[in-house]
Amino acid sequence: MRAIGVNSYGGPDALEVVELPEPHAGRGEVRLRVRAAAVNPTDTLVRNGARAEHQRKDPPPYVPGMDAAGEVDEIGEGTDTELHVGDAAMAIVVPDGSHGAYAEHVVVPAASVVRAPAGVSA
């Protein structure tokens, strides 16, 4: 899976295309096929290293992205949600490790994703 991440902290020029394993939804989780990701001020702090002490200690790359919009394409077994595969949805993503929204797919807790309002597209 392609994502935009950083292998070393810095300015916008530190962002690069990275390859990551495709994530899958587990129990209590929903996976989105990301169509849009906002640039949240927190994403800048992840990119420049200001949040390094608060991030998981996984090795880089770090993938920013707190806000995502797209389509639900996988729901973890036993997940309690009103969402269905194919629904347009929006999510708040906690950017720990490589789980930010600047990626082709993102997995989030079901409680962090909602159906997009009618007429809204990513």
Range-by-range predicted roles:
Residues T42-N48:
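Cytochrome P450 core scaffold surrounding the K-helix E-X-X-R motif
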Residues V18, D87, A103-E104:
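Extracytoplasmic/periplasmic beta-strand context in beta-sandwich domains
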Residues P21-A38, R51-P95:
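Glycine-rich beta-strand-centered segment in the early N-terminal region that forms part
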Residues G10-V17, P41-T42, D80:
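Short N-terminal binding/cap micro-motifs at the start of the first secondary-structure element
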Residues M1-R2:
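Extreme N-terminal starter segment of soluble prokaryotic enzymes
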Residues K57, M66, I92-A122:
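NAD(P)H dinucleotide-binding glycine-rich loop of Rossmann-like/cofactor-binding domains
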